[in-house]
Amino acid sequence: FLHPSRAWSVSSARLVPYGRVVTRSIPPVSKAALRSDTLKAFGRRKVSKMMMELDALDNEKSREKGTGPTVPSSIDWKGPLGVIKYPDPRLRAENKHITEFGRPLKELAEEMFQVMYGDNGCGLAAPQVGINYRLMVFNPEGERGKGMEMVLANPTIVSEGKDKDWFREGCLSFPGMRGKVERPTEVKIEAQDVEGNNIEFTLKGFTARVFQHEFDHLQGTLFHDRMPEEEFAAVHSRLVELEDDFVAHNPSLEDQIRRVGPKPARKLFGIL
């Protein structure tokens, strides 16, 4: 999520070729900010019986197919990381459940915070740096030392408030593009912190919007998917530019990307 008061940084403004990363020299994020007690104020709860039953069912199905558990035990990644750009197929790929917590996950979260701050963001999901796991980091203030840094693994939305509002969002994976998206102004969340502790809390306002934007990334949903027709038509040409640039740098992946298709027909007085 691009911070609304800032523009895309130099590194965000250029496309990162598939499989490559951007090297940055940014001071490391304070590990103290990533301790599990960062979210203690929001309370803790045990994983619900339903969630455990669903996980057990998924693993049972995979054993029946002879493929073993669908969830790997650890995350393999190499730094430095960089934001991948639309339409990189990893932005649409399935994101796996995290089962291993502790130092490796903390180090990944630290690296993601570095990338996020370096690109003027206030939220970042793991698939945006090419890691298809259910992990996000965010700080609505978008500045180290201000606000609260949050690291959420395996987040789920328990409930949404009835009220909704519109906001012109920007995304680090879509340089040079903003668009209006409607979202609930309040969401109740369950997740795990970097130590694997179960947490539950409610987010409101802009913080709720940042979370929902990043949660969409974990679902393989991109923010232009939620734009109304007229708004989508306004950003269509930019989406096509990003697609063409990606294919120019990665011709072998052209058949793996999902293009936006033709521009929606313009309506006259509400009638085509």
Residue ranges and their predicted role:
Residues 22-272:
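Positively charged
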Residues 1-26:
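N-terminal chloroplast transit peptides
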